[in-house]
Amino acid sequence: MPKQVIIPPGTSTPIAPFVPGTLADGVVYVSGTLPFDSANNVVYPGDPKAQTRHVLETIRRVIETAGGTMEDVTFNSIFITDWKNYAAINEIYAEFFPGDKPARFCIQCGLVKPEALVEIATVAHIGQPGGA
């Protein structure tokens, strides 16, 4: 099965050469997702909860556009700028993954825009269209 590019309506145009997501062999790969509006401006500066919610809602749109749900997520890579935001980010994260949690890692690092507090990249196994 060839790779399918996933670009949900209203998604910001990436500031680098990549797409929001790809689907191949029933697996959705969601690019690192930052708290950007459609013009690539950081939303909710200084608010880790609101930024995390925005990022996860964007990820959900990519996965749903590909035909999946957040329950299909199997792995998240989380990048945060400050450990002091870890609890706040986890609080919102838990709302999006109330049942069985996906595997993940979280590291502290700098992000592409200093106002961004969190970035998440995701893998979701949605199966093949029409079954399997």
From Swiss-Prot:
Q: What is its EC number?
A: 3.5.-.-
- Give the reactions, separated by semicolons, that this protein catalyses: (Z)-3-aminoacrylate + H2O + H(+) = 3-oxopropanoate + NH4(+)
UniProt xrefs under InterPro entries:
RidA_CS, RutC, RutC-like_sf, YjgF/YER057c/UK114
UniProtKB keywords: Hydrolase
Identify a single GO molecular function assigned to this protein. deaminase activity
Q: Which domain of life is it from?
A: Bacteria
Homology family? Belongs to the RutC family.
Q: What is this protein called?
A: 3-aminoacrylate deaminase RutC
Organism of derivation? Cronobacter sakazakii (strain ATCC BAA-894)
Upper taxonomic classification of the species?
Bacteria, Pseudomonadati, Pseudomonadota, Gammaproteobacteria, Enterobacterales
The gene from which this protein is expressed is rutC
